[in-house]
C-alpha cells in the first residue's frame, strides 16, 4: 500500500510547483515508473484519484509510462534487458549486473493551466 504515500508525495510536488510556477490547475500528470520500482500502476491510479480530490489536481488524467529495466554486465560489458533483480546476463550468464534503468519514479510531464 505504499502507493498512497507515493501519491501524497506527488501531490506535494504539484502543489509546490504550483506556487513557484504560478499554475492553478493540473489537467494531466505523466509519470515514468521503472519496471523494477515495485509500484502497482492500478493501485497508484486509484490512490491518485482519492488523494487529489479537492485539490488543484482533482479530475486530472494520470498517464503512466513504464521504463524497461536495463543493466550493465560487469564481466562482458554489455548493456542488457532484465526482467527482475538478480537475472543473469543473457550474453554471458553472469549475475554481476548493475541496474542502470528501471528503478525510477518521476514526473515526466505536466499539463497545467
UniProtKB/Swiss-Prot annotation:
One of its GO terms (biological process) is protein maturation. The keyword Zinc-finger does not apply. GO terms for molecular function: nickel cation binding; zinc ion binding. Keywords: Metal-binding, Nickel, Zinc. Involved in the maturation of [NiFe] hydrogenases. Required for nickel insertion into the metal center of the hydrogenase. Ni(2+) binds at residue 2. It comes from Acidithiobacillus ferrooxidans (strain ATCC 23270 / DSM 14882 / CIP 104768 / NCIMB 8455). The keyword Zinc applies. Zn(2+) binds at residues 73, 76, 89, 92. Belongs to the HypA/HybF family. Pfam families: HypA (PF01155). InterPro entries: HypA/HybF. This is Hydrogenase maturation factor HypA.
